[in-house]
Amino acid sequence: MAAPGSSFRAPKRSKAVGALRILRMKWGQLRRGSPEPAPVGRPDYYSRELSPTLFVRDAAILPQRTFLAADHREPAAVDLGRECFSTYGVYPLNFSFPQPEMMPSSLANRPHFLSSTIPGEPFSFDSWDDYLWEYHSSYFALSTKKGGWDTFRHLEILFSGTIPLIPRLAKANAFSLAHLPKRALMTVMEQLLAEGPAIPDDHTRAFFADFASQRLSSRAMASYVVEAAGIRGSRIMYLDHGLAARTDYLSAFTLIGLRQLLGETIIPGFEVDYLLDDFSGNTHRLYGRGFGYTKVLPARLRSPDSLDPAEADTVAGQADLLALAESCDCIVVGNYDGNRERVSALVNAGIPEARFVCILGSDLIPDRSMLAQIRKGKMTFFVREFPGI
């Protein structure tokens, strides 16, 4: 609880660092001739990252190869979390897949070596199933860094029973994409570049499918968050005011996973209707056309305690949020950048810092100043992107 007369200030990034990032972004847009934060309609921009030797379509002409040793292992998520916390004072968190049941049930042969779906292509599908079908017909698919290393495409590929090829992954920060099977992905890429295209054997394919199913579902990722942060209690508030109207991938996936794991224990401060299966609105207006995350939760999870987002900035709305926070054992902040002022207001109103678990889910990494502030405070932070190329 804030001391009498004191004013709590939630950790924030340096203005100078933020300004520098904006300048770099503007320079990139100028060079690309596009106002988008990442190249859109420019598949050539991303395809150039993959060796021309791997742009092979027909799988029938290729030999089979065992890419991974029989005893290949990846670090446990909780061990990676502890190592990251020791280094930066925060835990790594990545996108997750809300519907793991979509993983193909068999390792059938496929006609294509590399998927023809390339990052940067304009999105032209009206059906997610149609979009994923091309991945289902291929053994490998290109997936690159965009604004950050973490993209939903990696997961769409993996849960299609396909292996993503991620150029330059070996140069990324050790905690970027911490939850993906990075060692296996880098091993596969190295062998393809050194020995040429080949079809992965059943062991290799099964490893990636099993890893994704066990560790990359939204429920599995939520279990990691609960364990790493030590979340306990019968009432856990999920705070993200903007999510009710605008998608933030990491916040949405985390909320989905927590509700899949803990059910009605999770109380959204502001209900996110498009995540519930009785939503009747147009999901295609949402980010990514709503593919993969809309209408995935049973409507029975709708919380009667959630507040009206339209009233959030009124005096009455702020009082209601404080009352809800006081009634909860833990507060998970799904989009810290978008809710930082609300966090400050709640702490200054008497909610203990230690009750907050905050998620930094944007492409913008926390700078040294922010990390130092986080280390000094009592809130727990999860971070999606880390320093590096």
Q: Which residues does each predicted region cover?
A:
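Extended catalytic core of nucleotide-activated donor transferases of GT-like folds
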Residues: 1, 21, 28-79, 247-389
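Catalytic binding pocket for nucleotide-activated donors in carbohydrate/polymer assembly enzymes
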Residues: 115-119, 123-242, 249-262, 266-272, ...
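Short hydrophobic beta-strand segments
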Residues: 39, 43-44, 104-119, 231-246, ...
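Residue-level preference for short coil/turn positions at secondary-structure junctions
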Residues: 62, 107-109, 136-138, 160, ...
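Compositionally biased, charge-rich terminal segments
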Residues: 2-15
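N-terminal accessory regions of S-adenosyl-L-methionine
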Residues: 18-117, 179-192, 199-205, 209, ...
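A Trp-anchored, charged/polar loop motif used as the substrate-binding/catalytic surface
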Residues: 98-102, 125-126, 138, 220-224, ...
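Short amphipathic alpha-helical segments that mediate assembly, nucleic-acid/protein binding
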Residues: 13-20, 204-205, 218, 318-321
